[in-house]
Amino acid sequence: IAGAYEKRKVIGFDLNKNNLDCIKEALDNYIEPVQTQPTSSENVNYELIHDCGVEMVKFKEASNMIDLFINDIPYILSAEKYTDDPRDLCNIKDLDGFYERVEVMMKNMKRLIKTSNYEEGVIKPIIMKVGSQRRGNKGLMTMDTDIEMIGRKIGLTLHDKIINELRPSMQSYIINTSFQKRFTMKIMETNLIFVKYE
């Protein structure tokens, strides 16, 4: 939505039709009227695609066409359910299977993102917001580590890493458990910023 407000072309994939409908409503009712001036020929330009954002089939023959990817994939181990579609990452309970699909998605994003140029200060980022989960005696599983390794494997460069502090309303309820189990509260998510260099 922020991209549309800045008059950028927006392409969105989601397997949840309701999400796409909500975005479309916001773009049509709030962004487009603000951006469309009587003297301007620039209108909001967007394409919302009700399909798998891993495969991105519509763009399977394309390359070097995207200036920026913003991506918020589901947590690992089917922590939250968004659809019943088996292609949806939220439905993959197997950790290895989940990351195999993430690798497919990242390869597609690498193919589609434009090339960055460090010397000239041209950055065409792939921004992925990821989280972590505590799994009892299996410990803390952080998605950023695994996704950084996938990025390195497929030839993406980790340009930056941003830690976002969360302020969950239920935070006070987990303080006791945190003390008893001797771990800190999970109050952060991570943004990984990848780029593709020649």
Predicted regions span which residues?
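Class I S-adenosyl-L-methionine-dependent methyltransferase catalytic core
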Residues: 1-198
